[in-house]
């Protein structure tokens, strides 16, 4: 660790070229195309979807492996590289904000001025929305609790309480998996589908987009948990953990807005 700190004190950019960003971009595009084709019932569309999903997941895992090797074993994450990672993460969050803005825009566009075909009311005639204060409220408590535990684990690292930090990260990942399970349970037992008017479309699009981000954030936090277990995170060397925690708080904030708008206000 001493030699890694020594090399990381230099301002040179040591990270080599990586194929994973471009591979993830193309595989995500392929996954999106496969999703659309599958929803429209095109033949062999599931092959496109499965291929896109497999390449995306594989590329993300291999990308994560390379980052861990570069940062923890090779000492390639110098000050300049760390600054680049932080700037890249900020740009990533900004792009995510605009992605959710587009979804909420679609929701408000339909909800604030319902079309005549929908009965000029929101939710549309014939749609029975989910009970806000049952499973959605329970999921909200779970997700916000996970945010509290990840903050506890974060502070434990800087306080030198390694075991407490591991427990905090473990509970965060566990609660994230529970949230995803109940979200899937909610989808299965919902009284409407994505094809049931624009209400179903924007509901599943907004909550589904958030669900994808929950799964991605769970992966980030699980990697941070494993790195903490293997003594790869310190007070000075924690860019991956910091960005994972900030991303998780972003996911928490988006869900809180989703709960208030889609479930509480939109489902009333």
Curated annotation (Swiss-Prot):
* A single BP term in Gene Ontology: mitochondrial electron transport, cytochrome c to oxygen
Where does the signal peptide begin and end? none
Q: Which reaction is this enzyme known to catalyze?
A: 4 Fe(II)-[cytochrome c] + O2 + 8 H(+)(in) = 4 Fe(III)-[cytochrome c] + 2 H2O + 4 H(+)(out)
Q: Name one GO molecular function term.
A: cytochrome-c oxidase activity
Top EC category = translocase
Bilayer-crossing regions: 19-39, 49-69, 85-105, 124-144, 165-185, 202-222, 245-265
Q: Which UniProt keywords apply?
A: Membrane, Mitochondrion, Mitochondrion inner membrane, Translocase, Transmembrane, Transmembrane helix
**SUPFAM superfamilies in alphabetical order:** Cytochrome c oxidase subunit III-like
As for subcellular location, the record says: Mitochondrion inner membrane
Q: What Enzyme Commission number(s) appear in the record?
A: 7.1.1.9
* InterPro entries listed in its UniProt record: Cyt_c/ubiquinol_Oxase_su3 (IPR024791), Cyt_c_oxase_su3_dom (IPR033945), Cyt_c_oxidase-like_su3 (IPR000298), Cyt_c_oxidase_su3-like_sf (IPR035973), Cyt_c_oxidase_su3_a-hlx (IPR013833)
GO (cellular component) term, any one: mitochondrial inner membrane
Indicate how the chain sits in the lipid bilayer.
Multi-pass membrane protein
Matching entries from Pfam families are given as:
COX3
- Which family does the entry's similarity section mention? Belongs to the cytochrome c oxidase subunit 3 family.
Question: What is the recorded function of this protein according to its Swiss-Prot or TrEMBL entry?
Answer: Component of the cytochrome c oxidase, the last enzyme in the mitochondrial electron transport chain which drives oxidative phosphorylation. The respiratory chain contains 3 multisubunit complexes succinate dehydrogenase (complex II, CII), ubiquinol-cytochrome c oxidoreductase (cytochrome b-c1 complex, complex III, CIII) and cytochrome c oxidase (complex IV, CIV), that cooperate to transfer electrons derived from NADH and succinate to molecular oxygen, creating an electrochemical gradient over the inner membrane that drives transmembrane transport and the ATP synthase.
Subunit architecture: Component of the cytochrome c oxidase (complex IV, CIV), a multisubunit enzyme composed of a catalytic core of 3 subunits and several supernumerary subunits. The complex exists as a monomer or a dimer and forms supercomplexes (SCs) in the inner mitochondrial membrane with ubiquinol-cytochrome c oxidoreductase (cytochrome b-c1 complex, complex III, CIII).
Protein name per the record: Cytochrome c oxidase subunit 3
Highest lineage ranks of the organism?
A: Eukaryota, Fungi, Dikarya, Basidiomycota, Agaricomycotina
């Amino acid at each position: 660790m001493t030699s890694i700190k020594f090399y990381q004190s230099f301002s040179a950019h040591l990270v080599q070229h990586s194929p994973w960003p471009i591979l993830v971009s193309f595989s995500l595009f392929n996954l999106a195309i496969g999703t659309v084709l599958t929803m429209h019932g095109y033949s062999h569309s599931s092959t496109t979807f499965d291929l896109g999903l497999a390449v995306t997941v594989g590329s993300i895992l291999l990308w994560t492996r390379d980052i861990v090797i570069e940062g923890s074993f090779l000492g390639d994450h110098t000050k300049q590289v760390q600054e680049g990672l932080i700037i890249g993460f900020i740009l990533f969050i900004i792009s995510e904000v605009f992605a959710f803005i587009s979804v909420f825009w679609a929701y408000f566009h339909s909800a604030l001025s319902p079309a005549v075909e929908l009965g000029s009311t929101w939710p549309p005639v014939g749609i029975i929305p989910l009970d806000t204060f049952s499973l959605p409220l329970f999921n909200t408590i779970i997700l916000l609790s996970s945010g509290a535990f990840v903050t506890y684990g974060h502070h434990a690292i800087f306080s030198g309480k390694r075991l407490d930090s591991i427990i905090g990260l473990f509970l965060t990942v566990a609660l994230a998996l529970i949230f995803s399970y109940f979200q899937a349970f909610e989808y299965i037992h919902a009284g409407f589908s994505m094809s049931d008017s624009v209400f179903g479309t924007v509901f599943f699009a907004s909550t589904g987009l958030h669900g994808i981000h929950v799964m991605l954030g769970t992966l980030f936090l699980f990697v941070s948990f494993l790195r903490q277990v293997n003594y790869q995170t310190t007070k000075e060397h924690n860019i991956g953990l910091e960005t994972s925690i900030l991303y998780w708080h972003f996911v928490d904030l988006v869900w809180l807005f989703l709960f208030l708008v889609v479930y509480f206000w939109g489902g009333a």
